Amino acid sequence: RISNIQDGLVSLDNCVYIEGDIDKRFIISNGDLLIAMSGATTGKMGVYQYDCPALLNQRVGNIKVNTSLLLQKYRDYFMQSQGDLILKLSYGGAQPNVSAKIISDLFIPIPSLNEQEKIVAEIEKWFGFIDEIENGKIELESHIKKTKSKILDLAISGKLVPQDPNDEPAIELLKRINPDFEPCDNSHYENIEFDIPQNWVWATIGDIFEHNTGKALNASNPNGTMLDYITTSNLYWDRFELSVIKQMPFTESEIERCIVRKGDLLICEGGDVGRAAIWDYDYNIMIQNHIHRLRGKVDICTRYFFYLFMHYKLHNLIGGKGVAIQGLSSRDLHNLIIPVPSLKEQYDIASSIDLYFSKLDMITAEL
C-alpha cells in the first residue's frame, strides 16, 4: 500500500496478508520500483528490497525493469528526476492522481549499460558529497548551539568581559533600591554551580524588578475599556509574533497592573516556562495572566537579565529540577536568585553577547 512506501524504500510494517490464488500481474519482486498513484503523496517512490513476493495495491504502480536494457539504479534515479513532471501531469480534484498511461508515456534516454554504470556512479558520488555537507551542517549547527550556551555560561559567571576594579560594586545598585538590602545565599540551590566575581552580588528578581502578571480572561465580566493584549502564543525567545492580537476589557486599576511599556521584560509562566523577550515597541500593550511583566526598580540593563533567563532555561534552573517547579508562579519568580554585576558590566555583557550571537546567527543563516 502507499503507506508502505517510505524514504525511497518499501517497508513491510503493517502489511495486510491474504490467502488464495495470486494473479501474477500484481506480484512485486526484489528490485521493483513502486510509486504512489493517488492521494496527498502522489509520486512518492520506493524500491522493494525483499526476496519474498508481495502483491500490489490498486493505488500503487510498479515500474519493473528490463535488465538487458536498464540498470535498476539508473531507472531509480531517472524516475526521481521526473518527480516534478509526474506531479504536473497528474489530474483529479482536491488530490492529484496519476494514471498508468502518464508513467508509461514518459520518455527515458537509454545509453549503453556501461554508460549507465558511469552515470549512476557519478550521481552517487555527488550525492555522497551532498550527504557530507548536510551532516557537516547539522554538526556545525550543534557546535553553534553549544557555543552560544558556553558564551552564556561565561557571561553569567563574570568571565565574558574583563573585570574593572573601578566599577561601582553591584551591592551599591541594590542599596539604592533598598538601603537595608542583604546579599542572598545561593548555597542551597544545588544546580547553581558557579561562583561570581567579588564585586557582584546574589539577589532575587524581587530585589531588582517590580513584578506583575496580566489579567485572566473572564467573558462574564465586560467592565472596562476594550484593549489589545498578548498571550504566551505571541511571546517567543527575543521576539514577538503580533499577527494575531486579541482584545478584552480592562478597568483602570487593571490597566496599570497589566500594561506593558517599552523596555519591559516579559516571561512565560507556563508552556515553555521562562521563555522571555523585551517589549521594544513604541506603543503600549496589555498582557494576559500567563505572562509575567518585569520592570526595573532603578536603571538596569534589561537585556542582561533577558540573557540570564536564557541561561537559566538552558540549565533547567527554571521550569525544571532546580530553582523553580514546572510552571513559573509569581512567588517562584519573585524569589528566583540571580547573579547581579555592576550596571556598567551589565551593559558590557549584554553588548558582547549581542555581538557574538549576531556573528553566529550570520553563520547559521548561510548554512
Model-derived regions: residue spans:
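Sequence-specific dsDNA recognition surfaces
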Residues: 3-30, 187-191, 206-219, 233-262
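A short beta-sheet element
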Residues: 1-2, 19-79, 92, 99, ...
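Interdomain signal-transducing alpha-helices
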Residues: 75, 116-119, 305, 313, ...
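Non-catalytic DNA-recognition/assembly elements of restriction-modification systems
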Residues: 105, 109, 113, 117, ...
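Extended, domain-scale alpha-helical bundle/helix-rich regions
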Residues: 139-189
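Short amphipathic alpha-helical signal-transduction/dimerization elements
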Residues: 79, 83-87, 309-317, 357
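Short coil/turn segments at secondary-structure boundaries
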Residues: 12-14, 89-92, 162-168, 185-190, ...
